[in-house]
Amino acid sequence: MILKLHNTRTKDFSELTNFDNVKVYACGPTVYNYAHIGNFRTYIFGDLLIKTLRFLGYKVNYAMNITDIGHLTGDLDDGEDKVVKTAREKGLTVQEISEFFTEAFFKDCRKLNVVYPDKVLIASKHIPIMIEVVKILEEKKITYFSNGNVYFDTSCFKSYGEMAGIDLIDKDMTFSRVDIDKFKRNKTDFVLWFTNSKFKDQEMKWDSPWGFGYPSWHLECAAMNLEYFKDTLDIHLGGVDHIGVHHINEIAIVECFLNKKWCDIFVHGEFLIMDYNKMSKSRGNFITVKDLEEQNFSPLDFRYLCLTSHYRNQLKFSLNNLQASKIARENMINRLSYFYASLDPVALGVLNKDLKNFGFSEEKEYYDSFIEKVSFDLNISQGLALLWEIIKSENLSFVSKLRLAFIFDEIMSLNLREEILKNLENHDVVVDENMKTLIEERRIAKCEKNFKRADEIRDFFAKKGFVLVDTKEGTKVKRG
């Protein structure tokens, strides 16, 4: 099945027809603080895309950057370097700050089952290619030097801002650029290389043809893409806040460098909303994964919440919404645990042998429906609804329900199999009427000292994979 994605560049759906080597790049975190769950909604969306691609048979090469230098507090060309600012406030080096928060980021990713990239690109380790890109653009007369900084001249790139709807002919159009740099020729121009930092204590600087300085955030992503993926990129991921500045600047840099169109598909995830605003570190209204854990939520409760909404829709966050997701996830696990506990060893063997060896047409129909939903712009929320339909179905066997749940979980990544087994370790097996009858027969046999019959019943349960445990409260059934 071919994957279709909503393409921000074309404002339409694009098909991904190349199955052999899909190059995907995601804008990763700026490591000056803990990533918040608003950030992680975007990374979960990226994770769902990567897993869906691989599920559908695409071979994927997935890279993510780590911004440890050059991302200013204003996100444009104003403000202080975020990592430097945090380092100074905490009395640590930039390297200590960036390494600590990079490790914290990937630790939270593991808790949320967010896939680790095939390649992690740390900005400060790729300075030579960034300088080389600026030199080439300078040779093409696309840059200018002003007040100690190298600027990109957006008037040289006629399609600048098309993805964001910026019209360069309209001289009053500044999109999100509020603070106008008086040293720019055009309102939409942006810095490629800083040598005249607005702050004298800039810790990380490198020598360049324009003097000691450091790269801009936009240059970093563009140059690292060129170094790792060369002249082609299939999919670029990010949040909707990247559209109007960062990604249009990346496009301008790379396409002027290559003299051709670059990256056909840009995909953007919407905000996580809290109190009618996007979650934001700068505003101080943000929650981390650790905060959720301290309130007795599993990170997978938040992942479940993200699965309930399409990535292009804003998702409202509240503790009530998260609690509802927690209850729903636990209910799903409990139901699936009941199905699993009811299986005999033969049925378990069938389930564990080959998940996609469908024995019934209904299984294949549900599987095909799931594929159809996720392959059309990652409609994972519809896939989740389909899973609930399967769980509640009266026409499917327990094996069929579990088989489909485990298959869907290859993308959803709720750890369903692991959670079921953990659940059964901590709880007694739910017994059906036939089991209850045999347990009662065994109790009577023991009372009548008919130990042969009692042992026969015990052995019958053992062959099914169960252990009978006699307690003061009665006989409990556990997995063997």
From Swiss-Prot:
InterPro entries: Cys-tRNA-ligase, Cys-tRNA/MSH_ligase, Rossmann-like_a/b/a_fold, tRNA-synt_1_cat_dom, tRNAsynth_Ia_anticodon-bd
GO-annotated molecular function: ATP binding; cysteine-tRNA ligase activity; zinc ion binding
Highest taxon in the source lineage: Bacteria
EC number: 6.1.1.16
GO biological process: cysteinyl-tRNA aminoacylation
SUPFAM superfamilies: Anticodon-binding domain of a subclass of class I aminoacyl-tRNA synthetases (SSF47323), Nucleotidylyl transferase (SSF52374)
Localisation per UniProt entry: Cytoplasm
Cofactor binding note from Swiss-Prot or TrEMBL: Binds 1 zinc ion per subunit.
Enzyme class: ligase
Record motif 'HIGH' region, residues: 29-39
Residue window of motif 'KMSKS' region: 278-282
UniProt-annotated binding residues for ATP: K281
Binding site for Zn(2+): C27, C221, H246, E250
UniProt keyword annotations, A-Z: Aminoacyl-tRNA synthetase, ATP-binding, Cytoplasm, Ligase, Metal-binding, Nucleotide-binding, Protein biosynthesis, Zinc
Catalysed conversion reaction: tRNA(Cys) + L-cysteine + ATP = L-cysteinyl-tRNA(Cys) + AMP + diphosphate
Cofactor names: Zn(2+)
Family the entry assigns: Belongs to the class-I aminoacyl-tRNA synthetase family.
Subunit structure: Monomer.
Stored PANTHER family: CYSTEINE--TRNA LIGASE, CYTOPLASMIC, CYSTEINYL-TRNA SYNTHETASE
The protein, known as: Cysteine--tRNA ligase
Gene that encodes the chain: cysS
